[in-house]
């Protein structure tokens, strides 16, 4: 009994020791199931968002004034983020020099004589510039 015969006998012994019955192991005596089996995994919420459509406005659909306003807002958010990061870095610096003050926006929007809302935006941007410069100066004086 050598070679393939021995292998078959060992395989038969191993298979005879395997538990018979359900795929999931159960406690001795057939009590409660140790773990609930999900044949496709435990992904109960896999498809609950399938087929949903966005109800918000698409940024690519906007045209004309809406697009200009959106771009202006994006530029303002980007500049505000840069200034905030500059403040955080300046606060994290252990040096006692004051951070350089620079205007919030180096890009000055063109003024249309017909568009009074654009003038308000420019004035608001200047006001925000002055306020941020004041905050930076105060932070520089405290450190």
From Swiss-Prot:
Residues 54-143 form a propeptide. Residues 91-115 are annotated as: Disordered. Residues 92-111 have a biased composition (Polar residues). Pfam families: Bombesin. It comes from Cavia porcellus. GO terms for cellular component: extracellular space; neuron projection; secretory granule lumen. This is Gastrin-releasing peptide. Keywords: Amidation, Cell projection, Cleavage on pair of basic residues, Cytoplasmic vesicle, Mast cell degranulation, Secreted, Signal. PROSITE patterns: BOMBESIN.
């Amino acid at each position: 009994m050598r070679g393939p015969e021995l292998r078959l006998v060992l395989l038969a012994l191993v298979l005879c020791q395997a538990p018979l019955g359900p795929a999931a192991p159960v406690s001795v005596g057939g009590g409660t199931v140790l773990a609930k089996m999900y044949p496709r995994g435990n992904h109960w919420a896999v498809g609950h968002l399938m087929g949903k459509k966005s109800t918000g406005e698409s940024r690519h659909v906007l045209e004309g004034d809406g697009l200009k306003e959106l771009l202006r807002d994006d530029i303002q958010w980007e500049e505000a983020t840069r200034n905030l990061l500059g403040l955080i870095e300046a606060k994290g610096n252990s040096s006692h020099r004051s951070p350089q003050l620079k205007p919030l926006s180096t890009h000055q929007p063109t003024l249309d004589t017909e568009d009074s809302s654009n003038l308000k935006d420019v004035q608001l941007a200047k006001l925000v510039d002055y306020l941020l410069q004041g905050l930076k100066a105060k932070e520089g004086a405290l450190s």
